[in-house]
């Protein structure tokens, strides 16, 4: 039984990129699809497809290195982390992004700062 589907998604992405796979399949849920869309908008993945209840992410590589260097789950099922607009962290001195679940949906940290909303800090990507 899976207790944290977002952690499972991040682990699948991390493991697939370490094995230099060109894509990874993840079971569909609305929040995972939203996170995948943010990764595509921010340029961390090439393409994103949805078919038969599965999200397929196609990775970006530059000279054999993955575009995503690291992923980290922040808010976990045992310890939720909430931030206000002013407390949204800078990831890797601005070279990464954080993803938040807010009242306006799942968004990246830059959009959250512009929209002046806080929320649950889901994960960091760099």
Swiss-Prot record:
A single GO molecular function term of this UniProt record: structural constituent of ribosome
Function: One of the primary rRNA binding proteins, it binds directly to 16S rRNA central domain where it helps coordinate assembly of the platform of the 30S subunit.
Oligomer status and interactors: Part of the 30S ribosomal subunit. Contacts proteins S5 and S12.
PROSITE patterns (UniProt xref): RIBOSOMAL_S8
One GO BP: translation
Stated name of the protein: Small ribosomal subunit protein uS8
Keyword annotations from UniProtKB, A to Z: Ribonucleoprotein, Ribosomal protein, RNA-binding, rRNA-binding
SUPFAM superfamilies: Ribosomal protein S8 (SSF56047)
Keyword RNA-binding in record: yes
Pfam family, one: Ribosomal_S8
Similarity field: Belongs to the universal ribosomal protein uS8 family.
Classification via InterPro entries: Ribosomal_uS8, Ribosomal_uS8_CS, Ribosomal_uS8_sf
One GO CC term on file: ribonucleoprotein complex
């Amino acid at each position: 039984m899976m207790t944290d589907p977002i952690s499972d998604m991040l682990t699948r992405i991390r493991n697939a990129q370490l094995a230099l796979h060109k894509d990874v399949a993840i079971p569909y849920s609305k929040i995972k699809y939203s996170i995948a869309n943010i990764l595509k908008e921010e340029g961390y993945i090439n393409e994103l497809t949805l078919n038969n209840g599965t999200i397929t992410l196609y990775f970006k590589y530059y000279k054999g290195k993955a575009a995503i260097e690291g992923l980290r789950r922040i808010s976990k099922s045992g310890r939720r982390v909430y931030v206000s607009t002013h407390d949204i962290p800078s990831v890797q001195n601005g070279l990464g992004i954080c993803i938040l679940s807010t009242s306006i949906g799942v968004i990246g940290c830059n959009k959250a700062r512009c929209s002046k909303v806080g929320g649950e800090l889901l994960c960091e990507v760099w």
